[in-house]
């Protein structure tokens, strides 16, 4: 009997150490996770690498396709005489969000799938990529957007001119401040989602599935469009706004164009600061 009691006692205490749960479990993972070093500000060696230019081409093509599909969708809605005869605002939002989902999925392994200068700017502030790469991405994104809108106009010039070409403007009844605020908050939501979905620390955990990252990013774009299309037509992407404005090239398309650069860049900067300083507390970790 004593032997059996000893076996029971040993069995009950075989795993004497308590397993951490909740935040405690995350704390144990934190000890094993090592923060990747920040990207250098300038990386001249990138200019000699084919992967650098391949990534830029991927950004160009993705933004080209993004503008092509979304501008056509906007034109179709604006050309309709009845809300029931077209996809409406919900369809426009699905078009933008769905394209971002598909294009991020296709290009994430090549360029990171930014497709947006504001996203690139936010990731640059977080030292996720060099200034060299960030500037190259932004140029290629803008060129892709211009070409995408240009192809749409080439196919349907008359309809493009009469429906506004998908250019972003502050809607009547709203002030410039309203438009700027909508762009700041909308871009904050998008870029914060990008940071959360692509967080290397989360990728290191077994419970996180990196292949699903495009889904929340695309869904964030969808939701922001639902909320802000009535205010600004939803920019949150300076390349998208620039491409449509250049090809449409009417006076009112340029009246408030600065909003669609200043707003997204402020929103991206705030999202980068919030994620890196508040959520991840990276500056404080470096001091410890």
Curated annotation (Swiss-Prot):
Expressed in roots, leaves and anthers. It comes from the Eukaryota. It is a multi-pass membrane protein. A motif (NPA 2) lies at residues 237-239. GO terms for cellular component: plasma membrane. GO terms for biological process: response to water deprivation. A motif (NPA 1) lies at residues 116-118. Keywords: Cell membrane, Membrane, Repeat, Transmembrane, Transmembrane helix, Transport. Induction: Circadian-regulation. Expression is higher during the light phase than during the dark phase. Down-regulated by chilling. It is found in: Cell membrane. The keyword Repeat applies. CDD domains: MIP (cd00333). The keyword Ligase does not apply. It holds the Pfam family MIP. InterPro entries: Aquaporin-like, Aquaporin_transptr, MIP, MIP_CS. Aquaporins contain two tandem repeats each containing three membrane-spanning domains and a pore-forming loop with the signature motif Asn-Pro-Ala (NPA). Belongs to the MIP/aquaporin (TC 1.A.8) family. PIP (TC 1.A.8.11) subfamily. NCBIfam families: MIP. Aquaporins facilitate the transport of water and small neutral solutes across cell membranes. This is Probable aquaporin PIP1-2. The lineage of its organism: Eukaryota, Viridiplantae, Streptophyta, Embryophyta, Tracheophyta.
